[in-house]
Amino acid sequence: MATNARRRRSAAHGAQPNPSGPVNAGFALGNFKLPLILIAALLLLIFTSRVQQNDVVLWSFVSATAVLAAWLVYLLVLSNRRAEIHDFSIVLRSQHYVQLLIQICLFTYWGYYWRPVYDHALLIIAQLLFAYSFDILLAWSRRRAYTLGFGPFPIILSINLFLWFRDDWFYMQFLMIAVGFMGKEYVRWQREGRSVHIFNPSAFALGLFSAVLILTNTTSLTWGQEIASTLTLAPNIYTFLFLLGLIVMYLFSITLVAGMAAITLFACGALYNATVGVPYFLDSEIPAAVFLGLHLLITDPSTSPRTPLGKTLFGVLYGLGVFGLYTLLDSLGAPTFYDKLLCVPLLNLSVIAIDRAVRSIKSETLLNVWRADWLGGRANLAHMSVWVMVFVVMTALGKTDGKHTGDSLPFWEQACSNDLSNSCQRLVQLKTTYCNDNTAWACNELGIHFRQGLIVDRNDSQAQEYFGQSCELKFKAACANLLDDSLVLKDDPHELDLRLLLRQGGLNLMNASSNELYERACDHDWQFACSSNRNTL
């Protein structure tokens, strides 16, 4: 309570005149020691092997440190000239450090199965040092007292859960962080009599940079696609995210936002599947990265509705936004993983309108089941109970972890032969993914598709490349196709191919026994695997 009082006094006074008057005998560091230590720590990271191994990363660190140091010197000179004291107070908010712990758990679990996460850890630490330094200097530049706490942690970790720039473009990562904090500082409005930031800082930076990457067709500069697709390498990732989400839901009452977003996506996907005959998302009811986003990206209390019904509408709109953007991005030829990022800033803009519309409802009808005093103030527990039941049911139906209809290549081949919506395009997409993983069978299949020109435009040179790749992987049918342009020989996947084809978005099945492998293949509708005549390599 005393801490909050000190924070309010500091915020009110901002940069305060020094009661001792101007300092003539040299400079007084005062509170500038804090950003100086942070900048010095960032400078020291330059000498680590992770930074030294790439020149662009190295010069990105040097440039970021130089900019921060110059900014600090400028403010220090100015404050001494004006005899001002730049203040800060320590305020620890539970939503910040709880989200920090949740995100660390996720990075640790995910990184155990996808090691680039651990390799990226030092760069995340550098981003945190940069973020704290930048945020402090920005506040003091605006002659405002700085509130020191865990606030930058969830911002930086959220950004890194969805988008990293590759080493050769790493300076863009620092720029993205700077944009996020500047948006928090400058893009504000009056809400309930207080000046607050409009956008979730991480979502603002992610949304803006996602739009630029799409417009410039430069997604390859980032790890975005890999991040979105490797979450499922961690076993039972949906259950893991669900359990982490329950902690946040219980402590901060965000169940209506996250739960309704998920339920909306489940419902829309089920309706699409029933109508068209194929899954809406390629191999899941909700992509794992989207499931992560609806738990950690849209649930910021500062940039989401305050009313229960408003939270419900916010979650529904996020679900509908992701659902629509997936198709829109796909039709534009853009990577679909941006779907979860682009709609958040737009939803943040709608927050006041949503709350105003909800508060204008005076009816005592069904809408009021979302009142805060429902069940003696324990409405959130009731909402959580509903969400738990929904997740349990969807898991029992195979809609979260485990085998999904879209994991089966024979399913997509049958759907393509029946000319179901987008099925041929997705079949080629899946085979391309597996061929890139050096699945010999998939490469031969792609060669056949490009030679025949039935579901893709005919391209003989492309076909030869795929046949050559498959032949190098010792797939005999591909070698024959490579030598004779008139052939389109097929064969069943070899055992090594199955270890890649049946991974269901997870780790390769290199340690599975042959019996386990063929049982899984049979379960995935590979008919040859259900018989005793098996083709092994």
Model-assigned labels for residue ranges:
Residues 17-140:
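N-terminal signal-anchor module of multipass membrane proteins
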Residues 205-206, 213-266, 270-274:
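Internal active-site segments that recognize and position negatively charged phosphoryl groups
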Residues 430, 445-452, 481-488, 500-504, ...:
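Hydrophobic face of amphipathic alpha-helices that form TPR/SEL1-like repeat modules
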Residues 417-422, 436-437, 454-458, 472, ...:
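Short coil/turn and helix-start
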Residues 138-231:
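Membrane-interface helix-loop-helix junctions at boundaries between adjacent transmembrane segments
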Residues 375-401:
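Internal/C-terminal transmembrane anchor helices
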